[in-house]
């Protein structure tokens, strides 16, 4: 008596045939805020507090008359508090960035809007603090004052402006002509005209210009990454939320931010089939710092 034939078993679906779930954020907005946004913001608040004690301030500012600022800058305890706050803030910001990156790299959090919110929250406390790590922003302001006075900044240094030292200009660059382009000098002139004889207010307005560059980066980098087959969230996390970017471009208020932001925006719109606008934006970036013009031929390659 023969055995019954085995029942037909349908072949298993190959893993490649299985539907791939769309990546979604692995936690709620509240979880995201508690895990990354709030700790990073506390970090930049501490950095801003530290900047009151060890950041660059011009001699000609009423902020030095504030008793808290005076204590942070003129006493041993104040110096210790300022340095401790700065170091603790940087460590906390770095930790928050790395934790966020862990989620992004695992694909747990790919929501660009969340990353933009984290960036805005981390930057906010740095908007009003004294410049850190560089006082170039006061040289920008002085060069704007040169323009207002009708002095050619390509032949004369910031020392040609009366009171340049009290304005916070670094003596190392006081005699040097400007290395920057016409577009940046026009912006600096506008800031100097608007703020008048108030170098710290001028520095804060200059910071708005550099933050505009960071905003352009945050918009452009994900688009460039998408066209290159890279996850936009990973590119945004690595290229814009990086603490080095926040320290140099926001806390340091360095005009490299505007140059790089314009160039990145130019590349992004070129990839979106707007090459003429791309050329204009990259050219403006080169008119902030002439080294940016090196990027112009790459628009042609993308075109």
Indicate residue ranges for each PLM-predicted region:
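Start-transfer (signal-anchor) and selected internal transmembrane alpha helices
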Residues: 1-46, 66-125
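Alpha-helical transmembrane segments of multi-pass membrane proteins
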Residues: 41-62
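Transmembrane-helix motifs of polytopic, lipid-linked glycan transferases
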Residues: 91-101, 204-228, 237, 261
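Transmembrane-helix signature of polytopic, membrane-embedded enzymes
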Residues: 109-117, 221-243
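Intramembrane catalytic core of multi-pass membrane enzymes that act on lipidic substrates
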Residues: 109-211
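Aromatic- and kink-enriched transmembrane "portal" helix at the membrane-lumen/periplasm boundary
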Residues: 199, 203, 214-217, 237-259, ...
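Specific aromatic-rich, kink-prone transmembrane helix
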Residues: 216-220, 259-274
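Perimembrane helix-loop-helix junctions
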Residues: 294-303
